[in-house]
Amino acid sequence: MSVSLSRLERQLGYSFKDQELMLLALTHRSFAGRNNERLEFLGDAILNFVAGEALFERFPQAREGQLSRLRARLVKGETLAVLARGFDLGEYLRLGSGELKSGGFRRESILADALEALIGAIYLDAGMETARDRVLSWLASEFESLTLVDTNKDPKTRLQEFLQSRACELPRYEVVDIQGEPHCRTFFVECEVTLLNEKSRGQGVSRRIAEQVAAAAALIALGVENGHD
């Protein structure tokens, strides 16, 4: 094992028994051979479970939608990338030459994906309890700063944060119709989300309100909220 990887293990607070798992977690798909995408898939599932379980215990009075919004904030790519940069994770990534030249070691999505892959690797190397311990340790300051006030965001913001946490494209809004007299108009808006087969719709006395209604409908269609939060 190289000195650099020993340093990374100290930063992560975990020493791998299987060094190949660690190396695989640090290997981007642009690098020749096997890559970290399967570990990322596993780590994402573990991260969401651990964060959800911790929020369930921390906020016993929170509604489902509130818990979902808090979790989306915890596991979004931006949060994970900040953690990854704190570990200097970009210095250890194995990238293809093209990705390396384009600055992939600084890219938010690549850093976040690699951190999720490391979570998956720790789980395979040492089991759920150790993976849970590491995740909660890394996210401790984020957990401490959370309050239910963080859930009081408008639907467009909540939808954007949810999609960002899944590394999905941002929603697209389009005014499809305007009805009524100039002093009393009704705007009809469609919201397109790549995860949904159908566009969500909203209407209101302004474009902004119609977009918020459409975003709220998209959150319900995605199963993030149930319409009663």
From Swiss-Prot:
Principal subcellular localisation of the protein: cytoplasm
PROSITE patterns: DS_RBD (PS50137), RNASE_3_1 (PS00517), RNASE_3_2 (PS50142)
EC number, as in UniProt: 3.1.26.3
Keywords of the record: Cytoplasm, Endonuclease, Hydrolase, Magnesium, Metal-binding, mRNA processing, Nuclease, RNA-binding, rRNA processing, rRNA-binding, tRNA processing
Subcellular location: Cytoplasm
GO-annotated cellular components: cytoplasm
Gene3D superfamilies found in the cross-reference section: 3.30.160.20, Ribonuclease III domain
Enzyme active site: 44, 116
Enzyme class, spelled out: hydrolase
Family classification: Belongs to the ribonuclease III family.
Protein's name according to its UniProt entry: Ribonuclease 3
The organism's taxonomic lineage, starting at the top: Bacteria, Pseudomonadati, Pseudomonadota, Gammaproteobacteria, Pseudomonadales
Gene name, Swiss-Prot/TrEMBL: rnc
